[in-house]
């Protein structure tokens, strides 16, 4: 049975959920009253034994045992174990519900795809849907206690009308040592193919859709069979059960109220009813009972699935849809809103308060001033920015600056390998001035000539063929005629790696600023090329070789 209380909690009001505590069927009281009575009986029996039977020495020994149990009882991770276990059981329970076979989609397809209002067509449709119901009954009979009690043998299925005598004999001839719940689905598939070959099903697309739905129902039945076969590991269930019961066995001794005259910590009061121990019993033991009830929803508990009702409903609805409702349509008539573009269904007096206007969006409730609705031109926007944004105190606070403002980059320096020792500042300054003179001296020199063409950025040509000149001599080029720039460049190529520092003063005009940026970028490229070329010839001073120039 299934306990339905949805209507009682439809509205969250005062006492709506509290009224559920008065229910008996499916309640925690019905599940726990037996264990609770046993626990209370044992608790007060131990209490009477401690108060009236034991001697003073025995009472002292019992008190030590009670303090020991109460101090170590919290080491049992009962909340941790129960939380994971109940979560696993509830997810498994819901998955089994989702795999319950409902033939509604299949009966709609059979009623519409299988044509013919004659005796043969009617027999074909009823037989197809009866095979589907028979497959569901066979699997539910295998996993549900209530269904098995209703149909204990296959002969009872014949008497109930789910199977004919010929089908019963055909099923017995198979002689398989396995469950035969899958046989009606095979009959359904073969009969559907026969109906297609006989012209009862027009198209292969319709046949494929019918087969897909049958395979879906067969898969759901297989899932239920697998859930019934593969249970939650027994060791997990045993661990949870032992943890809960051992916890409350320790509570029988550890939660006893000791003699308050002996000043034991936590035992200043001598109560008769252990209120919080009883509440803890209801919570933890009820938590375990939830898992015990949901671990197999095909039993006869109050919250188990109504499998017998499902069988009755599926048979009645399916036969009606494929037989009495086949091609039995009501006459088509114009609806009452035929000429209305926006129909307004009426409300009753009880539902008038639930009428609402259409939701247009959250921004439709925003109201703007009249001056905020005026359109601005670009010139007015720029003027307003200059007057109110850049010159105001708030604009300065927010860091708003005009477009023609440039950051005052003074004494912009690029220092490489230069010590910050005060004694060497003069040497660094002289070296920087000398480096700047060298840069301006070779400003017009094309330094890309020392780089092979296939290594230049943007060049896609391969390396040149090896020259016929020896390695010690440079190959002549068109740029090495007379006293050209190549002589000066050779001097640079023999220089060691230098430390270059550029002192750039940014001009105020934008044009000079751009030119200075290009000069800064070119100087940085010059330094990188000099460094790369110097590293590629580490022993040129000793060997006295000259670099090979490429065009």
Swiss-Prot record:
Pfam families: Bestrophin. The gene is Best1. Belongs to the anion channel-forming bestrophin (TC 1.A.46) family. Calcium-sensitive chloride channel subfamily. Residues 476-488 have a biased composition (Low complexity). Residues 52-60, 256-274 are extracellular. Keywords: Calcium, Cell membrane, Chloride, Chloride channel, Ion channel, Ion transport, Membrane, Metal-binding, Phosphoprotein, Transmembrane, Transmembrane helix, Transport. GO terms for biological process: chloride transport; detection of light stimulus involved in visual perception; gamma-aminobutyric acid secretion, neurotransmission; glutamate secretion; protein complex oligomerization; regulation of calcium ion transport; regulation of synaptic plasticity; transepithelial chloride transport. Ligand-gated anion channel that allows the movement of anions across cell membranes when activated by calcium (Ca2+). Allows the movement of chloride and hydrogencarbonate. Found in a partially open conformation leading to significantly smaller chloride movement. Upon F2R/PAR-1 activation, the sequestered calcium is released into the cytosol of astrocytes, leading to the (Ca2+)-dependent release of L-glutamate into the synaptic cleft that targets the neuronal postsynaptic GRIN2A/NMDAR receptor resulting in the synaptic plasticity regulation. Residues 465-475 have a biased composition (Polar residues). This is Bestrophin-1. The keyword Membrane applies. It comes from the Eukaryota. The C-terminal auto-inhibitory segment (AS) modulates the open/closed conformation of the channel. In a closed conformation, the C-terminal auto-inhibitory segment constricts the channel concentrically by wrapping around the channel periphery in an inter-protomer manner. To allow chloride movement, the C-terminal auto-inhibitory segment opens partially, leading to significantly smaller chloride movement. It is found in: Cell membrane; Basolateral cell membrane. Residues 459-489 are annotated as: Disordered. Interacts with YWHAG; this interaction promotes the ligand-gated L-glutamate channel activity leading to the positive regulation of NMDA glutamate receptor activity through the L-glutamate secretion. Inactivated by sulfhydryl-reactive agents. The keyword Signal does not apply. It is a multi-pass membrane protein. It catalyses: 4-aminobutanoate(in) = 4-aminobutanoate(out); L-glutamate(out) = L-glutamate(in); chloride(in) = chloride(out); hydrogencarbonate(in) = hydrogencarbonate(out). GO terms for molecular function: bicarbonate channel activity; chloride channel activity; identical protein binding; intracellularly calcium-gated chloride channel activity; ligand-gated channel activity; metal ion binding. It comes from Mus musculus. The chain crosses the membrane at residues 32-51, 61-82, 238-255, 275-288. Ca(2+) binds at residues 10, 293, 296, 301, 304. Residues 346-379 are annotated as: Auto-inhibitory segment. Residues 1-31, 83-237, 289-551 are cytoplasmic.
């Amino acid at each position: 049975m299934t306990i339905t209380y949805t209507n009682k909690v439809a509205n969250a009001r005062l006492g709506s959920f509290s009224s559920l505590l008065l229910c008996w069927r499916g309640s925690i009281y019905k599940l726990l009253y037996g264990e609770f009575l046993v626990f209370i009986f044992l608790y007060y029996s131990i209490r009477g034994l401690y108060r009236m039977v034991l001697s003073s020495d025995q009472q002292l020994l019992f008190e030590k045992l009670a303090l020991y149990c109460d101090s170590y009882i919290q080491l049992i991770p009962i909340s941790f174990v129960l939380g994971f276990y109940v979560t696993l059981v509830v997810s498994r329970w819901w998955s089994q519900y989702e795999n319950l076979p409902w033939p509604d989609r299949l009966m709609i397809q059979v009623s519409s795809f299988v044509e013919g209002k004659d005796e043969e067509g009617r027999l074909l449709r009823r037989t197809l849907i009866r095979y589907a119901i028979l497959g569901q009954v066979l699997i539910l009979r295998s996993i549900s206690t209530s269904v098995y009690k209703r149909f204990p043998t296959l002969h009872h299925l014949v008497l109930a009308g789910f199977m004919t005598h010929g089908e019963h004999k055909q099923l017995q001839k198979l002689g398989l040592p396995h469950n035969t719940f899958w046989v009606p689905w095979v009959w359904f598939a073969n009969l559907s193919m026969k109906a297609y070959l006989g012209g009862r099903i027009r198209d292969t697309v319709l046949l494929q859709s019918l087969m897909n739905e049958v395979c879906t129902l067969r898969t759901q039945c297989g899932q239920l069979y697998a859930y019934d076969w593969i249970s939650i590991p027994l060791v997990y269930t045993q661990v949870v059960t032992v943890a809960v019961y051992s916890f409350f066995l320790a509570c029988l001794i550890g939660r006893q109220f000791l003699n308050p005259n002996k000043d034991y910590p936590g035992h200043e009061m001598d109560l008769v009813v252990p209120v919080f121990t009883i509440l803890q019993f209801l919570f933890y033991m009820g938590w375990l009972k939830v898992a015990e009830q949901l671990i197999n929803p095909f039993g006869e508990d109050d919250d188990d699935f109504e499998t017998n009702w499902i069988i009755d409903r599926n048979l009645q609805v399916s036969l009606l849809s494929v037989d009495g409702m086949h091609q039995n349509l009501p006459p088509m008539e114009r609806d009452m809103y035929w000429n209305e573009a926006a129909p307004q269904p009426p409300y009753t007096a009880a539902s008038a308060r639930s009428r609402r206007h259409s939701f247009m969006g959250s921004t439709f409730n925003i109201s703007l001033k009249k001056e905020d609705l005026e359109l601005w031109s670009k010139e007015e926007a720029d003027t307003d920015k200059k007057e109110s944004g850049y010159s105001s105190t708030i604009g300065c606070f927010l860091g708003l600056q005009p477009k023609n403002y440039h950051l005052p980059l003074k004494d912009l320096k690029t220092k490489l390998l230069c010590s910050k020792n005060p004694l060497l500042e003069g040497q660094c300054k002289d070296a920087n001035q000398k480096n700047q003179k060298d840069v301006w001296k070779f400003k017009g020199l094309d330094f890309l000539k020392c780089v092979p063409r296939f290594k230049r950025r943007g060049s896609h040509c391969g390396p040149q063929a090896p020259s016929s000149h020896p390695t010690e001599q440079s190959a002549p080029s068109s740029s090495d005629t007379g006293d050209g720039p190549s002589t000066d460049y050779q001097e640079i190529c023999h220089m060691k790696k230098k430390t270059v520092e550029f002192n750039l003063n940014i001009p105020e005009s934008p044009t000079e600023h751009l030119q200075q940026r290009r000069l800064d970028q070119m100087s940085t490229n010059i330094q990188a090329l000099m460094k790369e070329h110097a590293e590629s010839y580490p022993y040129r001073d000793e060997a006295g070789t000259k670099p090979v120039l490429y065009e």
